[in-house]
Design a protein with these regions (language model features):
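Single conserved hydrophobic/aromatic residue that forms the stacking wall/gate
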Residues: 160-169
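Internal hydrophobic scaffold segments of catalytic domains
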Residues: 49-59, 97, 108-114, 169
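Accessory N-terminal region flanking or inserted into the helicase ATPase core
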Residues: 2, 109-159
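Short, compositionally biased low-complexity segments
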Residues: 2-8, 87-94, 130-137
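Charged/polar, solvent-exposed surface patches and flexible loops
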Residues: 17, 34-37, 62, 112, ...
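P-loop NTPase motor core
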Residues: 65, 69-127
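Walker A/P-loop-proximal flanking segment of P-loop NTPase domains
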Residues: 1-65, 70-81
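Glycine- and acidic
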Residues: 14-19, 40-46, 99-103, 141-152
Length: 169
């Protein structure tokens, strides 16, 4: 019987794609349990380039994201943690911003690229503008993130303005 080899995920940083297309993968899903068991207000992931930081962040997003595809975790080690999966999987809005694609010769160009990244992520949460939980100030602040010509001063506060409306979750 001939054994079919899985493809190597060279350059793939999207956990859902990696799982859906059956790439070879070293199961690091217990990182999720480790983070929940050793909860900290801030977690800093330091590793050299090409060590899977973005893929791990994508895995965290896939796990926690509202209405995420739970099939991504079928057969993984974390799926055996039934209680943990019931409590946390697919229950939260997840803000996912990677700055690794910002490569510019000038500060202005880098700032423009950062604006586009934040703008794209804010669009994913546009539905929050319909929430009755948000004040008009919060809605106005959030709307400023949706403008393609966002000001640099708005960019500086963008993580606050994206995350504040998700707080009730």
């Amino acid at each position: 019987m001939k054994q079919i080899k899985k493809k190597l995920p060279i350059g793939i940083e999207n956990f859902a794609k990696l799982q859906a297309e059956d790439f070879y993968y070293v199961d690091k899903t217990m990182l999720i349990k480790e983070l929940l068991d050793n909860w900290a207000e801030v977690n800093l992931f330091t590793r050299p380039r090409r060590f899977g930081k973005t893929l791990n962040m994508s895995m965290l997003k896939a796990f926690f994201e509202l209405n995420g595809d739970k099939n991504c975790f079928k057969g993984t080690r974390i799926s055996r943690e039934v209680y943990l999966c019931e409590q946390y999987m697919g229950k939260f809005p997840v803000i996912f911003i990677s700055l690794k694609s910002i490569s510019a010769q000038t500060y202005e160009k880098a700032c423009d690229m950062a604006i586009q990244i934040v703008n794209g992520e804010a669009r994913r949460f546009q539905y929050l503008l319909d929430s009755e939980r948000l004040t008009e100030y919060d809605k106005d602040a959030f709307k400023s993130l949706l403008l393609p010509d966002m000001k640099e001063s708005v960019l500086c506060l963008s993580l606050i303005h994206i995350s504040e409306p998700t707080r009730p979750y």
